[in-house]
Amino acid sequence: MGKLGISIYPEKTTEKEVLDYIDKAGEAGFSRIFSCLLSANESREVILEKFRRINWHAKEKGFEIILDVNPRVFNDLGISYDNLSFFKEMNADGVRLDIGFTGLQESIMTFNKENLKIEINMSNITHYIDTIMDYRPNRDNLIGCHNFYPHIYTGLGLDFFKKCTENFAKYGLRTAAFITSQAENTFGPWPVTQGLPTLEMHRDLPMIVQFKHFVALEMIDDIIISNCYPTDEELEEFKKVRKDMVSFSVSLEENIPEIEKKIVLEEFHYSRGDAPENLIRSSNSRVKYKGHEFKLFNAPEIIRKGDIIIESSEFGHYAGELMIAKKEMRNTGKSNVVGRISEEEIFLIDYIKPWQKFSFVEK
């Protein structure tokens, strides 16, 4: 993945709270800011001064700053698409066009003298991005970002999301999407506060699980927290989670032997290329520990989806191989269930593709 991001809404809170949040997020590994101008209703001078101070602080902490705008904002602030110097004065690194222009204007904007990134709204299936590409933009300054959706049931479906994202990915453009905090009394740019996910299926999931889902999909570069303010505990999880692969949270059997525990938590895992229908197979451990006696110690009659299996020596040359159950199945009596993936993360199994890497962390 690319960057972890946060969102800030200076007109909705105090400047101190915004700056404190930026500091906390920076310490947790975040390096991108989505800052909304759509709901800012002050004068040009007041907006410039307020955002400049905040953005300067953020840049001192190593953040990239993208401002969310639309044609109305351009009009209200007296900005022309061929002169973006106002945003540079605000210490921004780019602008996100919530609503676009004609395609030609966006192309011209990517050649702006200030070298600002021009971010396009990804959450639609039209030929909008194709039109922009027809006008030969500066690809180095063209990126994409999905919307978030405050109203329950209005978030994107997964299939639609994939189609929208693929439309941008085919051009090799950097992409972004939003996850939502589950903290109480959060807010965004609008009065409705029922969470702010890109995907509807994420609305009630723990924020770290939403993140892991995007990592599993392998379609999104930058992942941004949309609402303010996540809890310290939510931010803390991002210090520990792997960003380069899905890291399943697991509970291990109390009597798991040391070698089996080491296989789960320390060995390098990836799904075999000849991926079966019922299991995710990680075979390296059976080679590394060839000759070790894997005794039967927990062979339940039924293996459930989400169970982690390490084959016993009664399975011959399969002994020591790690598997994840993708479906419920009857145990042959030779398979040890050594642990189980957290219930809220079991659905992530369905998104692990052949050769995809994954890991485990004990709860």
Tell where the protein language model's regions lie, with residue ranges:
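Short, acidic/polar
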Residues: 13-26, 76-86, 129-130, 206-213
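Catalytic alpha/beta core domains of metabolic enzymes, predominantly
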Residues: 121-254, 263
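Glycine-rich, proline-tolerant flexible connector loops at the mouths of alpha/beta enzymes
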Residues: 31-54
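N-terminal active-site wall of soluble small-molecule enzyme domains
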Residues: 48-93, 104-105
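C-terminal functional modules
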Residues: 253-363
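Active-site mouth loops of central-metabolism enzymes
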Residues: 2-19, 68-79, 193-205
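Hydrophobic faces of well-ordered beta-strands that scaffold small-molecule active sites
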Residues: 2-10, 33-35, 63-71, 93-97, ...
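Catalytic domains of carbohydrate-active enzymes, especially glycoside hydrolases
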Residues: 17-39, 89-94
